[in-house]
Curated annotation (Swiss-Prot):
It catalyses: XTP + H2O = XMP + diphosphate + H(+); dITP + H2O = dIMP + diphosphate + H(+); ITP + H2O = IMP + diphosphate + H(+). Substrate binds at T10, S11, N12, K13, G14, K15, S72, F156, G157, Y158, D159, K179, H184, R185. The lineage of its organism: Bacteria, Pseudomonadati, Pseudomonadota, Gammaproteobacteria, Pasteurellales. It comes from Haemophilus ducreyi (strain 35000HP / ATCC 700724). Homodimer. Its cofactor is Mg(2+). The keyword Membrane does not apply. Its EC number is 3.6.1.66. Belongs to the HAM1 NTPase family. The active site is at D71. This is dITP/XTP pyrophosphatase.
């Protein structure tokens, strides 16, 4: 089978691991942007869509390949949707998962049980080329709640704090195969596949 090469526009190793197998099953030969020596551009957009488009356009421009990018985050009801767009740098340092979780726990300290609802949101964008005027855009959401302490060793980001009621565990307590089937990113990838 002739597989289409596509650059995965993320520097997040957790996202690469989570997305590459799924995209490969869709018939793509996935090449992480790190293999080209690229890092993601600054996320200056005001929405998940804008940030995903920025990343995909940059990766496509720099590699000459079609690109796929994800922008995702955790939106907590009691925090008016925060950390939201700033999930990866919530504590002020890019991709410091431990610091981000600590800050979230500190901000949620006085939020009572029953008012700790949250959702993971993923926006995935696919471009055929840098100036593609009709990008494919897909969304996925997973609903849960924020625990008072971390549980589980798997995953990344806020997974150890995100309790998923449908499985009665945190995302960090799921094995990678199970998470790839039910996560917000998995749901967005399935929605994207329907557009291909």
């Amino acid at each position: 089978m002739n597989r289409t090469k596509i650059v995965l526009a993320t520097s997040n190793k957790g996202k690469v691991k989570e997305m590459a197998d799924v995209l490969s099953a869709f018939g793509f030969e996935v090449i992480a942007q790190s293999e080209f020596g690229l890092v993601s551009p600054p996320e200056t957009g005001l929405t998940f869509v804008e940030n995903a488009l920025l990343k995909a356009r940059y990766a496509s421009k720099m590699t000459g390949l079609p690109a796929i990018a994800d922008d995702s985050g955790l939106a907590v009801d009691a925090l008016a949707g925060a950390p939201g767009l700033y999930s990866a740098r919530y504590a002020g340092i890019e991709d410091d998962d431990t610091a981000n979780r600590r800050k979230l726990l500190a901000e949620m300290q006085n939020v009572p049980d029953g008012q700790r609802a949250a959702k993971f949101v993923s926006c995935i964008v696919m471009l055929k080329h840098e100036t593609d005027p009709t990008p494919k855009i897909a969304f996925g959401e997973c609903f849960g709640e924020i625990l008072r302490e971390e549980r589980g060793q798997n995953g990344f980001g806020y997974d150890a704090l995100f309790f998923y009621p449908a499985k009665q565990c945190t995302f960090a307590e799921l094995d990678s195969t199970e998470k790839k089937q039910i996560s917000h990113r998995a749901l967005a990838l399935v929605a994207l596949q329907k557009q291909l």
